[in-house]
Amino acid sequence: MTKRLQARRLDGIDQNLWVEFGKLTKEYDVVNLGQGFPDFSPPDFATQAFQQATSGNFMLNQYTRAFGYPPLTNVLASFFGKLLGQEMDPLTNVLVTVGAYGALFTRFQALVDEGDEVIIMEPAFDCYEPMTMMAGGCPVFVTLKPSPAPKGKLGASNDWQLDPAELASKFTPRTKILVLNTPNNPLGKVFSRMELELVANLCQQHDVVCISDEVYQWLVYDGHQHVSIASLPGMWDRTLTIGSAGKSFSATGWKVGWVMGPDNIMKHLRTVHQNSIFHCPTQAQAAVAQCFEREQQHFGQPSSYFLQLPQAMELNRDHMIRSLQSVGLKLWISQGSYFLIADISDFKSKMPDLPGAEDEPYDRRFAKWMIKNMGLVGIPVSTFFSRPHQKDFDHYIRFCFVKDKATLQAMDERLRKWKELQP
């Protein structure tokens, strides 16, 4: 065809690191510590709930309410209403989506107009920018910057800090949305109450909606506490909070997510949802409903999966830190999420001429070198930064530690071989 095929909204967002790295992982014998998914089974109660949903009530094979299976929206409203200090209506304050990804896309499409500005704190989950652009918005970036670690000690993810003055300077009359992600992907940073209060005050001062991506809210470590910004004074009325069943119950393939917020905003999301996705798989929603009903009974007790999972993953994190240190990687201690990041600055000075395109960030070339030569997959952190800042942050690699023990043992074996090759 001679006519232009692709819509202009796709300009500049057609290149995707995940496609390229996914292909590389198939070509080489690797231990995949790159993508954020568990390679262990969900808890027994979750798999049993899914089995029951697929083999029990035959009507679960049919459509349910478009905006969410009623038992699921009921339990989400009850469970999170207590945490947020809100009386939530399951019909108007909760929308079930195809994963948290679907919730994000629906919100950008519902709220962002041509020329609207969206503040994104980077490093950021890499779909925020293209989703903003597809909706016609203009991404505006605020960069978290690391404080140097004390000599002889590891840095912590919470050492990556916002500059309050820089953040305040990004708000303009065109600012429509601020995107918050806590715990943060890729850093593992858990935003403190003081940081959230700063963000909340600015959102209220400038009449801005906060999109709060909290899919890792149960995965916090070392006694840190996740705080939902919607629970702060004055923020419920301007916050949309995103959650994920996949991250909550270690079942990322179920693709059930949700968004919660005030009806005057949610009604616009429902309009997008009913004219795009329309409906999410009933059986998966039924399984998630059972999982939350079970968790509601055990919440705060040792039998709670939301306590058991972070306890187990904290041990995984510590294992990975020790192992990666053995080959000279400098680690930042993750305080939340699936991930931690490693500083590869020393390798950049020792191995500056790795193969790759001239304008390709160093961490991307290093990650490919690891795949091809060491059989380890990590994700270059520069991909989570806006293009103008990628060269400034091209010396970090993200690793996922939410993996099975066998995977961590396979990682150890690759690292032993790596260490043997070092001079």
Curated annotation (Swiss-Prot):
pH behavior: Optimum pH is 9-9.5.
Annotated positions binding substrate: G36, N185, R398
Swiss-Prot/TrEMBL keywords: Aminotransferase, Cytoplasm, Lyase, Mitochondrion, Pyridoxal phosphate, Transferase, Transit peptide
Post-translational modification N6-(pyridoxal phosphate)lysine, affected residues: K247
Cofactor requirements of the protein: pyridoxal 5'-phosphate
Subunit structure, interactors included: Homodimer.
Protein function: Catalyzes the irreversible transamination of the L-tryptophan metabolite L-kynurenine to form kynurenic acid (KA), an intermediate in the tryptophan catabolic pathway which is also a broad spectrum antagonist of the three ionotropic excitatory amino acid receptors among others. Metabolizes the cysteine conjugates of certain halogenated alkenes and alkanes to form reactive metabolites. Catalyzes the beta-elimination of S-conjugates and Se-conjugates of L-(seleno)cysteine, resulting in the cleavage of the C-S or C-Se bond.
Protein name: Kynurenine--oxoglutarate transaminase 1
